[in-house]
Amino acid sequence: DTSNASTWRVTDIRSGSIGSNPGWNMDVILVGDTLYFDAIDGSSGRELWAHDTSNASTWQVADICSGSSSGDPGVGGMEILVGDTIYFVADDGSSGYELWAHDTSNASTWQAADIRSGSAGSIPGVNMAILVGDTIYFDADDGSSGYELWAHDTSNASTWQVADIHSFSSSAPGTTMAILVGDTLYFSARDGSSGHELWAHDTSNTSTWQVAEIRSGSPSSNPGNSMEILVGDTIYFDADDGSTGIELWAHDTSNASTWQVADIRSSSMSGINGANPGQNMVILVGDTLYFDALLSSGIELWAHQPGEITSLSSGSGNGSGGGMTNVTGATSCVATPS
């Protein structure tokens, strides 16, 4: 309790020395005063649990996979709140990992969709899960077309494949990035002729297209592998064009232009591995983007504003606290959209 500095064990879900490992699979979700999370009690496997912070009660919400086996709610990283209902991945022991739901208003739990018939499971949302209105967009494998973009409309419980980007194989949407701009999803995918590149799906008219092929041919540019952030209408992300290494790129969604923002670590500096911007941190403060990047002097803090890119440190070696210097006299590069 931050008001009186007291600390206490809230509950002992699994008696003994092993522990219940709450939140192992899924990020805790707060609905009203109640926390929802996965935990294992030692008898029913890892299942969905809840803790009401208003009265300190804790209970198992549902035993999705009956017996000692685990339902593993939230495995793979998909959990999303729509109204009073939590949507998540779970395995009931017969249909594999599929999309499930729990309505917190009436305590009902059900399988929302069985995308891949049989016991294998479609493992939805392993790479991406984004809510647009009442509809969840996510990747899933139906067993025939591989991992593609799917959707589930929570208002009418309908589920469908949005696009088969890579016919007869997986396009693996969202493997390196997925972000919503207005009604349009921007995500990484591969179509079989080009590698993992930047794609888009307009949810208002159901059109899907490749936004940019940053690295020509079958190799991948892997957009957003380390960072992706929206500034106004522009997405900033890391990508590898095959010649300058992994550097800072941008896509203006208002005019469909894509460009390399800066070649921070030029090819003349120890090969073409690139600066790997945002590998450890990225944050937007006002109009300025702050991120880490690699130069010959090591990994340091950098910043970008429209029209310029500036190093905020000097000297050699990696910064480890402190080391911040005035930007005056720091390395500066300027790039403009093409």
Give the role of each language-model region.
Residues 1-313, 319:
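Feature 14080 marks short, conserved micro-sites in well-ordered regions
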Residues 310-336:
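Ser/Thr/Gly/Pro-rich low-complexity, disordered linker/stalk segments of secreted
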